[in-house]
């Protein structure tokens, strides 16, 4: 099972890429504490206020275009960026074997952005 979502941001693909890959930017909207090496094979650690911690490995990173993370629970998130009139469309596809945790974190993470 997967969750699929599209969001259009009034920013360039490069600006959106920074918000998706730079730890200090991710801490503004996604998780409380972030460590991320946004290159293929790079590691990521995401911590939330509720004490939840998730680890990820960057499978694919094409700056301004596509980011794929493999989560420590065998789930994944694929983010594809596309320049559109007025900004950047981000197409998000998340898959996870344990949807109870994934849905909770999905709600915590994406609600402030949408």
What kind of feature is each model-predicted range?
Residues 34-98:
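Hydrophobic-ligand binding "helix-grip"
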Residues 95-114:
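A conserved amphipathic terminal alpha-helix motif
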